[in-house]
Amino acid sequence: MTVVSGASKASGADLLDYDVVVARFDPVFGLEVHVELSTVTKMFCGCATTFGAEPNTQVCPVCLGLPGSLPVLNRAAVQSAIRIGLALNCEIVPWCRFARKNYFYPDVPKNYQISQYDEPIAINGYLEVPLEDDTTWRVEIERAHMEEDTGKLTHLGSETGRIYGATTSLIDYNRAGVPLIEIVTKPIEGAGVRAPQIARAYVKALQDLLRTLDVSDVRMDQGSMRCDANVSLKPIGTVEFGTRSEIKNVNSLKSVEMAVRYEMQRQGAILVSGGRIAQETRHFHEDGYTSPGRAKETAQDYRYFPDPDLEPVAPSRELVEQLRQTIPELPWLSRKRIQQEWGISDEVMRDLVNAGAVELVAATVKNGASSEQARAWWGNFLVQKANEANITLDELAITPAQVAVVVALVDEGKLSIRLARQVVEGVLAGEGEPEQVMVDRDLALVRDDSVMQAAVDEALAADPDVAEKIRGGKVAAAGAIVGAVMKTTRGQADAARVRELVLAICGQG
């Protein structure tokens, strides 16, 4: 047994060797994922939900909780919640309602948050999570419920950016009232040594699913997807769960894995030393450790009661069935089918998935390109452009249809690959459609034999020694003349045709 005192340099906490943890304890974890829905307006008012607006410019009496204001439920948010529940194999309840979650904090202007307590819209689901070894792990879903988001606090003056040690706190209420769906798993047992990886895989699968449903952009870096992880340990062979700690606002896939692993090691060190785990919330730090937050509240602390300003929600069976028809193929099943259709290896498919290119390649193929051509563009050149701009592939200012047009221009002999890249750069720069960029930049391949022959004659005259070598049978020397012609024509001549003309003129054709 190895307990390393102060093993976490940043936190100073004792950590138990990971192999010892999983040999002695069964980790039990649960995940609560908060997802901002991509609706145009907020959950209970008409304010915009645009990310990045000037602070406190997307607010009104309703989301500020001013006296006399009344909430009006966003129908689109309810429909998105139902679709999410269906995609998670949940039961959509015939009747649910909102409750007030009462607590006092600066980011809650009403001093309560409108949420759902004991009557959520979706219950008892599951998600088959694909793992890296091509197996799956079923994660049971306890509930998915609707609520409004809180405002955003920015703490100044502390080294960590958190409230501890801060001298000033700024509040932006633009986020207050943005529609949220909170997806809560049942306790996940039996994962053993794979617990951190399964936690990460679940959040990744959920992220892919919600993106496919087009209900959220699930940008963890922007806070539109946030994860809380509940972790506890119990001795192997026992039934009763241990005391859990809740790790708040874990904001990346890597952090989910790191947070679960660290917390297992921290709790393991306490338990083998005869200590007790405190029921508390903890903050995750990017250095890979957690620190104490506050004592964990219970449901009674929030004094839930039905919101008297909102009627119950009772989705009809007809509506639920209509929305069921809009649920697309699960993204990982779609990828497996696509991989078989394209005949590509697991490694190539993994690279496309990691680049976020699968759906873009598939859409390009639907627009007429071959899978090889589409992969070459999205998996190489366009990935480079996205990385240079520090954005994701789907944020590039080019569509799969436009990429397919570029591919067609190459196939038709109007562009070389090098010229096609310049056309794509023009599209990315906002210069117009591919054909227009080709014309405006004068990038079309030169196909006129008379123009190319004149350029060949000029190049041969400028380098008589090379011309003589070609006439003497050294056809490899034709490359120098081809290069000179390509330079003269700015790379727009058909190199293969230029070579044919050079050899013909020199009597080697």
UniProtKB/Swiss-Prot annotation:
Source organism per entry reads: Mycobacterium leprae (strain TN)
What top-level branch of life does the organism fall under?
Bacteria
Cited SUPFAM superfamilies: GatB/YqeY motif, Glutamine synthetase/guanido kinase
Q: Its encoding gene is what?
A: gatB
Ordered alphabetically, the record's keywords are: ATP-binding, Ligase, Nucleotide-binding, Protein biosynthesis
Return the similarity comment.
Answer: Belongs to the GatB/GatE family. GatB subfamily.
Query: Would you tell me the protein name for this molecule?
Result: Aspartyl/glutamyl-tRNA(Asn/Gln) amidotransferase subunit B
Q: Which InterPro entries match?
A: Asn/Gln-tRNA_amidoTrfase_suB/E, Asn/Gln-tRNA_Trfase_suB/E_cat, Asn/Gln_amidotransferase, Asn/Gln_tRNA_amidoTrase-B-like, GatB, GatB_Yqey_C_2, Gln-tRNA_amidoTrfase_suB_CS, Gln_synth/guanido_kin_cat_dom
Q: What is its EC number?
A: 6.3.5.-
One Gene Ontology term of the biological-process aspect is: translation
- The reply on keyword Nucleotide-binding is yes
Q: Which GO terms describe its molecular function?
A: asparaginyl-tRNA synthase (glutamine-hydrolyzing) activity; ATP binding; glutaminyl-tRNA synthase (glutamine-hydrolyzing) activity
**Residue ranges crossing the lipid bilayer per the database entry:** none
Kindly give the HAMAP family that the UniProt entry links to this protein.
GatB (MF_00121)
Subunit structure and binding partners: Heterotrimer of A, B and C subunits.
Which PANTHER family has this protein been placed in? GLUTAMYL-TRNA GLN AMIDOTRANSFERASE SUBUNIT B MITOCHONDRIAL AND PROKARYOTIC PET112-RELATED, GLUTAMYL-TRNA(GLN) AMIDOTRANSFERASE SUBUNIT B, MITOCHONDRIAL
- Gene3D superfamilies the UniProt entry points to: 1.10.10.410
Q: Which Pfam families does UniProt cross-reference here?
A: GatB_N, GatB_Yqey
Q: Which reaction does it catalyse?
A: L-glutamyl-tRNA(Gln) + L-glutamine + ATP + H2O = L-glutaminyl-tRNA(Gln) + L-glutamate + ADP + phosphate + H(+); L-aspartyl-tRNA(Asn) + L-glutamine + ATP + H2O = L-asparaginyl-tRNA(Asn) + L-glutamate + ADP + phosphate + 2 H(+)
Purpose: Allows the formation of correctly charged Asn-tRNA(Asn) or Gln-tRNA(Gln) through the transamidation of misacylated Asp-tRNA(Asn) or Glu-tRNA(Gln) in organisms which lack either or both of asparaginyl-tRNA or glutaminyl-tRNA synthetases. The reaction takes place in the presence of glutamine and ATP through an activated phospho-Asp-tRNA(Asn) or phospho-Glu-tRNA(Gln).
